Amino acid sequence: MPKGSQTSLTSNLMLAWGYANGDIDFTMHFSGPLLPEIDRGLGITVVAGVHVGCFELFAKEDIRGVADLKGRTVGTLGLGTGPHIFISVMASLVGLDPAKDIVWVTSEKVEPVELFAEGKIDAFLGFPPEPQRLRAQKIGHVIVNSALDRPWSQYFCCMLAGNREFVRKNPVATKRVVRAMLRATDLCVSEPALVAQRVVDRGFTPRHDYAVQTLAEVPYNRWRDYDPEDTIRFYALRLREVGMVKSNPAKIVADTVDWRFLNEVRRELGG
């Protein structure tokens, strides 16, 4: 890709394609869904945890917890996507078999949030600005808030990962990317109004108020405190339990992470 350019990929399949073709050097991606791709041999190195708590599990009012999803319809763009993987892990922790006990409704043409708002599905995993919209419209309620509820609040949801060969061959550039990402994360804490306006100006959301709410609700201040390796181990174990990865957590950690750049940036930025 040209220097300084960016692209948006909406699925794990496109992510894998982008890495394989050399179109992507770095991605900020949901932690859990990275691991099945790594387990299948995708050359990714995870270099930092970025933030915690960007997803919320919305459900109809009669569903009071994850266990109540048994036999209910749950929307996702596709099997193997981030929401499908996260909800599968949640379900397995309360004794459900996500492959058998949940009725997955997949749609590439209609967003799950729209199906939920129309009452066509019972639950879905929302990401900003979807939760902010649903709260404003008083649609459904949250049964899992990853910013507040354990164990999800104890682990990163989004992590910075790089093309393995790029990271190996370009340590100086990799460190610059890590530093830039974490300084931007700090800016979300120190200058939320400025960041919210830039999010709107760049077309990521038309609603300034939703952007402000997101910056207030998502914990962007945890990257100094949390050990990102804990996140990799947690999701590797959980995904192995539901059959989405074959490797054990120790092997995934050994093959996948490089915290040198994060540790250097922590010392430079304080933390």
Language-model region placement:
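Short, glycine-/small- and polar/acidic-enriched structural segments
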Residues: 1-108, 115-118, 122-128, 139, ...
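Short polybasic/polar patches that bind polyanions
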Residues: 38, 92, 135, 200-201, ...
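A generic short alpha-helical patch detector that favors 3-5-residue windows
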Residues: 79, 151-154, 206, 227
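Pocket-lining segment of extracytoplasmic ligand-binding domains
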Residues: 32, 111-202
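Short amphipathic alpha-helical segments at helix boundaries and their inter-helical linkers
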Residues: 120-122, 218-232, 263-271
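Conserved C-terminal helix/tail region of periplasmic/extracytoplasmic solute-binding proteins
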Residues: 240-271
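Secondary-structure end/capping motifs
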Residues: 168-247
